[in-house]
Curated annotation (Swiss-Prot):
Residue sites binding [4Fe-4S] cluster 2 per the record: 157, 161, 164
GO CC annotations, alphabetized: cytosol
EC number of this enzyme: 2.8.4.3
Catalytic activity, as annotated: N(6)-dimethylallyladenosine(37) in tRNA + (sulfur carrier)-SH + AH2 + 2 S-adenosyl-L-methionine = 2-methylsulfanyl-N(6)-dimethylallyladenosine(37) in tRNA + (sulfur carrier)-H + 5'-deoxyadenosine + L-methionine + A + S-adenosyl-L-homocysteine + 2 H(+)
Pfam families membership: Radical_SAM, TRAM, UPF0004
Keyword Transferase: yes
Predominant place of localization: cytoplasm
Gene name linked to the record: miaB
Database matches in PROSITE patterns: MTTASE_N, MTTASE_RADICAL, RADICAL_SAM, TRAM
Subunit structure: Monomer.
Cofactor(s) the protein requires to work: [4Fe-4S] cluster
Coiled-coil segments on the chain, per record: none
Binding locations of [4Fe-4S] cluster 1: 12, 49, 83
Name of this protein: tRNA-2-methylthio-N(6)-dimethylallyladenosine synthase
C-alpha cells in the first residue's frame, strides 16, 4: 500500500522543478503518492526560498501549523528543503526539534536515504552539502501529464551580487551534461510535452565541457534542443546580462521554436547602484542587448527584476530607473523593496532611506510597468495569436487558458479536447493581467 506525500513549495520555478523531482524519486523508491491535504500525509515537506526577508520566520510559522499532526500520527515525518534549509541547517532542528529531515537543493536526491536513516536511528537527519552533479545522476526519469514542463539545465550562481544569498544556498554554477539534458527533453516530448522551459539561476551561464561534441555553451545547447522532433516551443529563465552573448542573440534569428519573450533582470537603472550591487554591466551594455534583440525580433517581450531602495539609492538613481523603463518598455516585472539577506556584503551597507519613500518608489515603478503592459496588450486586440492550451482557466473553470508566444495568458471558451494542442485565438479584450479571446477557426 502506498503512503502519502505532501509538498508545499515556495519561491521560483527552480523550486517547482525540485518539488516535482522530490515527488518522482519518492514515488520511484518509496511508492509515495502526492496529496494536497497535509492531514493525509505520511511525509510533509516544505521546499523553501530565502530570497526575501523573513523567509526563515515564515518557515517556522508553517512548521508550527503542522506540528500537532504528529500527535495523532506519531510516524509522520516532517522535512524542510530548499534554500532556507541550506542557510539554516541544524538551526532548524534546534528551534523545531520535531523536524525530522533537513536537506538542501543539491541533496534532495538523498531523501530516501535520509528517511531510512531517520527511521533507523530515531535522530533528525541534516544534509546540506553541495555534491557537484550527483543530484541529477540519481533522479528518476521525468514524469508529466501536461503540455509544458520545466527542465533544469544548471544550478547555482558564481556571480556573488552583493545583495544575493543564492551562491551561499545553491552553491557555485554547475551545468548538466548535454546528453542528460537532451535525454530529459526528448523523454518529456514523448509524454506529450510541446513546450519546455529551461531553468537555471543563471541559465545562460550553461557550459558543458564533458560533451564529446566539444565545449557546449548555452546557444549551442539551444541549437541541439531545437532539433528534437515534436517540441514546438522553447523558453528559458532566468538569464543574466553578463552572459547574454552575441551568439545567444543570434539564436533568435535562426531558431523559430525560441519564443518571443526574454526575462532579463536589470535590478536598477542607475550605473552607480549596479556597481554597488556588483552586477558586472552598465545600462548602456544592457540597452545594447535589448536593441540587438529587437532588431532581430521587433515584437519581442522583455520582462525584468527590479530592487527598489537598495542602500544608498537616491532620488536621482530612482529617476534613472524610471527612465530606463520608458526607454526599454518592459511589459512585466518582479519588483521588490530591498531586504538585507544575512551574510551578504550589502547587508553591511548603511541604509538611511525611510521605508515610506521606498514603498512610494515601488508603487511608482509598478504602475509604470503596468501601463506599459496594458499598452502592449491593447495592441494585441483583434490580432490572431497562436496559443498552447494548458488547461482550465484559473478565473473560470468552465473556460480554458493558454500562453501566447510573448508570454501573455489568454482565457477563452473551449473544450477539454483542446488541452495540449495549439489553437489560433483572436484577441478580443484586455484585463489587468490577462487577455480574452475566442477560437478563430472553431477548432
Amino acid at each position: 500500500m502506498s503512503s502519502k506525500l505532501y509538498i508545499k513549495t515556495f519561491g521560483c520555478q527552480m523550486n517547482e522543478y525540485d518539488s516535482a523531482k522530490m515527488a518522482d524519486i519518492l514515488l520511484s523508491e518509496k511508492n509515495m503518492e502526492l496529496t494536497e491535504v497535509p492531514e493525509e500525509a505520511d511525509l510533509i515537506l516544505f521546499n523553501t526560498c530565502s530570497v526575501r526577508e523573513k523567509a526563515q520566520e515564515k518557515v517556522f510559522h508553517d512548521l508550527g501549523r503542522v506540528r500537532h499532526l504528529k500527535n495523532s500520527k506519531p510516524d509522520l515525518l516532517i522535512g524542510v528543503g530548499g534554500c532556507v534549509a541550506s542557510q539554516e541547517g541544524s538551526e532548524i532542528v534546534r528551534r523545531a526539534p520535531f523536524v525530522d529531515l533537513v536537506f538542501g537543493p543539491q541533496t534532495l536526491h538523498r531523501l530516501p536515504e535520509l528517511i531510512d536513516a531517520r527511521r533507523r536511528t530515531g535522530q533528525s537527519q541534516v544534509d546540506i552539502t553541495f555534491p557537484e552533479i550527483e543530484k541529477f545522476d540519481r533522479l528518476p526519469p521525468a514524469r508529466t501529464t501536461g503540455a509544458t514542463a520545466f527542465v533544469s539545465i544548471m544550478e547555482g550562481c558564481s556571480k556573488y551580487c552583493s545583495f544575493c544569498v543564492v551562491p551561499y544556498t545553491r552553491g557555485e554554477e554547475v551545468s548538466r551534461p548535454l546528453d542528460d539534458v537532451l535525454t530529459e527533453v526528448a523523454g518529456l516530448v514523448i509524454q506529450g510535452v510541446k513546450e519546455v522551459t529551461l531553468l537555471g539561476q543563471n541559465v545562460n551561464a550553461y557550459y558543458d565541457k564533458t560533451s564529446g561534441e566539444g565545449d557546449i555553451d548555452f546557444a549551442t545547447l539551444l541549437d541541439y534542443i531545437h532539433e528534437i522532433p515534436g517540441l514546438v516551443r522553447i523558453r528559458y529563465t532566468t538569464s543574466h546580462p553578463r552572459e547574454f552573448t552575441a551568439r545567444l542573440i543570434e539564436t533568435y534569428q535562426r531558431l523559430p521554436k525560441l519564443v518571443g519573450h526574454v526575462h532579463l533582470p536589470i535590478q536598477s537603472g542607475s550605473d552607480r547602484i549596479l556597481a554597488a550591487m556588483k552586477r558586472g554591466y552598465t545600462i548602456i551594455e544592457y540597452k545594447s542587448i535589448i536593441r540587438k534583440l529587437r532588431t532581430i525580433r521587433p515584437n519581442i517581450s522583455i520582462s525584468s527584476d527590479f530592487i527598489v531602495g537598495f542602500p544608498g539609492e537616491t532620488d536621482t538613481d530612482f529617476e534613472e530607473t524610471m527612465k530606463l523603463i520608458d526607454d526599454v518598455k518592459f511589459d512585466e516585472s518582479f519588483s521588490f523593496i530591498y531586504s538585507p539577506r544575512p551574510g551578504t556584503p550589502a547587508s553591511d551597507l548603511p541604509d538611511d532611506t525611510p521605508y515610506r519613500i521606498k514603498l512610494a518608489r515601488l508603487h511608482q515603478l509598478q504602475e509604470k510597468i503596468q501601463r506599459n503592459a496594458q499598452m502592449i496588450s491593447q495592441s494585441m486586440v483583434d490580432t490572431i495569436q497562436r496559443v498552447l492550451v494548458e488547461g482550465p482557466s484559473k478565473k473560470d473553470p468552465n473556460e480554458f487558458c493558454g500562453r501566447t508566444d510573448n508570454n501573455r495568458v489568454v482565457n477563452f471558451a473551449g473544450h477539454a479536447g483542446l488541452v495540449g494542442s495549439f489553437v489560433d485565438i483572436k484577441i478580443t479584450a484586455v484585463s489587468s493581467h490577462t487577455l480574452r479571446g475566442e477560437i478563430s477557426d472553431m477548432q
